[in-house]
Amino acid sequence: MADESKFEQVKGNVKETAGNVMDNKDLEQEGKEDKASGKAKEVTENAKDKVNDFIDKLKK
């Protein structure tokens, strides 16, 4: 899953840069949204991992 969120961030960065270079504000905005979505997924995944690690420690 972490790879998916990183890929989404990279894809967003490419779109944002392309939109900026081509002066395409819609593409640039779409890229920003993809980056933000990917980052949010990454943060959620990290939080889930930490909770699961904590639960595993409690079970021991």
UniProtKB/Swiss-Prot annotation:
Residues 1-60 are annotated as: Disordered. Signal peptide: none annotated. Gene3D superfamilies: YjbJ (1.10.1470.10). It comes from the Bacteria. InterPro entries: CsbD, YjbJ_sf. SUPFAM superfamilies: Hypothetical protein YjbJ. Residues 23-60 have a biased composition (Basic and acidic residues). Belongs to the UPF0337 (CsbD) family. This is UPF0337 protein SSP1897. It comes from Staphylococcus saprophyticus subsp. saprophyticus (strain ATCC 15305 / DSM 20229 / NCIMB 8711 / NCTC 7292 / S-41).
